[in-house]
Curated annotation (Swiss-Prot):
Lineage: Eukaryota, Metazoa, Chordata, Craniata, Vertebrata
Family: Belongs to the serpin family. Ov-serpin subfamily.
Keywords: Acetylation, Cytoplasm, Protease inhibitor, Serine protease inhibitor
Site feature (Reactive bond) residues: 344-345
A GO molecular function held by the record: serine-type endopeptidase inhibitor activity
Gene: serpinb1
A single GO cellular-component term on record: extracellular space
Cell compartment(s), UniProt: Cytoplasm
Protein name (record): Leukocyte elastase inhibitor
Position of the signal peptide: none
Main location: cytoplasm
Coiled coil: none
Record function comment: Regulates the activity of the neutrophil proteases.
Length: 377
């Protein structure tokens, strides 16, 4: 399972860099585990070059028993007897009703990913099909993502829509008090600032300082400590954009593990903005640009393990995500070398009044459920 979590983390940083090419300074928020799960379902029915490209881009080549590992991971994430937080990862295929999908593929998808095939009439009722898909996603994300497919996203030529939704709502183990929240400036870059609702608390929390990139790392656990938000904050803005350039260049699985391994509980004065991010991505161009091109090309895609025919291809991967961070905790949804320890003072400052990276981690499996950059209110 650790190999699978590592693969998903590798992929999340690769995808972040790709998204960054067209959005170097804006807010970013997506669920790598959600996108990886969706594409792993496609991989079950992919063959030849198409399968090789998916495996390579998602770093699945090093993962033994990939699909049974996903089955275990999904079961761990979707634990039913947890009362302290809500976390739901849901998958579904919507296929054109006249199109024949192979029984072996359907049973494998059901067994490994708990995903059913919903049959819809794309040919003569594409708009009704779109509404049905949106309703399903809205239900899975508790209404936070009401419309994953916008008007015109499907048409009479659509054969298959792959939908993956993830929803999370959790309370902080140590909540911020609402009376401590105040209007404060948030520095976007060296020249601009905006006002945010800045939360505050002083608590004993896992903390680390990374001198080589002048960054602070803070872990904010959720109730029961099964999940945490980890925030990586540069000391200040030292470049001409968000102040995150050096940190983003250094991002890797190895570095993140290194930075978060040696965290020490210490009294920290935490200043963190309340924020809400919503993002929508059409990932076809990014994934194709990363080397997963065949899947989206009629004539090149080999999904013969799904249907036995050669005319099936994926037209788009649409991913929508939502996160809200407040005094109580977080609500989020998405669809489709040793470290030199600095001499720690008794108290540390963690003032997130300028751009930072953050991720929400499932601690037992070390899986990054959500990854984001907060750079502008």
């Amino acid at each position: 399972m650790e190999n699978l979590s590592s693969a998903c983390t590798h992929f999340s940083f690769d995808l972040f860099r790709k998204i960054n090419e067209n959005n170097a300074t804006g807010n970013v928020f997506f669920s790598p585990i959600s996108i990886s799960t969706a594409l792993a379902m496609v991989l079950l029915g992919a063959r030849g070059n198409t399968a090789q490209q998916i495996s390579r881009i998602l770093h699945f080549d090093a993962v033994k028993d990939l699909h049974s590992n996903f089955q275990t991971l999904n079961a761990e994430i979707n634990k039913k007897n947890v009362s302290s937080y809500a976390l739901n990862l849901a998958n579904r295929l919507f296929g054109e009703k006249s199109f024949k999908f192979l029984p072996d593929f359907l049973s494998s998808v059901k067994k490994q990913y708990n995903a059913d095939l919903g049959t819809v009439d794309f040919i003569s009722a594409a708009e009704d099909a779109r509404k049905e898909i949106n309703t399903w996603v809205s239900e899975q994300t508790k209404g936070k993502i009401p419309e994953v497919l916008s008007a015109g996203a499907v048409n009479s030529f659509t054969k298959l829509v792959l939908v993956n939704a993830i929803y999370f709502k959790g309370d902080w183990a140590k909540k911020f008090k609402a009376e401590h929240t105040k209007d404060m400036p948030f520095q976007l870059n060296k020249k601009e600032q905006k006002t945010v609702k800045m939360m505050y608390q002083m608590e004993k929390l896992p903390f680390n300082y990374i001198p080589e990139i002048n960054c602070r790392v803070l872990e904010l656990p959720y109730v029961d400590y099964e999940l945490s938000m980890v925030i990586v904050l540069p000391d200040n803005i030292n470049d001409d954009t968000t102040g995150l350039q050096q940190l983003e260049k250094e991002l890797s699985l190895e570095k993140i593990n290194e930075w978060t391994e040696n965290m020490m509980p210490i009294d920290v004065h935490v200043h963190l903005p309340k924020f809400k991010l919503e993002d929508s991505y059409k990932l076809k161009s990014q994934l194709a640009g990363m080397g997963m091109a065949d899947l989206f090309e009629a004539g090149s895609a080999d999904l013969s393990g799904m249907s036995g025919s050669n005319d099936l291809y994926l037209s788009e991967v649409i991913h929508k995500s939502f996160v809200e961070v407040n005094e109580e905790g977080t609500e989020a949804a998405a669809a489709s070398a040793g470290i030199a320890m600095m001499c720690l003072m008794r108290e540390e400052e963690f003032n997130a009044n300028h751009p930072f990276l953050f991720f929400i981690r499932h601690n037992a499996t070390k899986s990054i459920l959500f990854f984001g950059r907060y750079s502008s209110p």
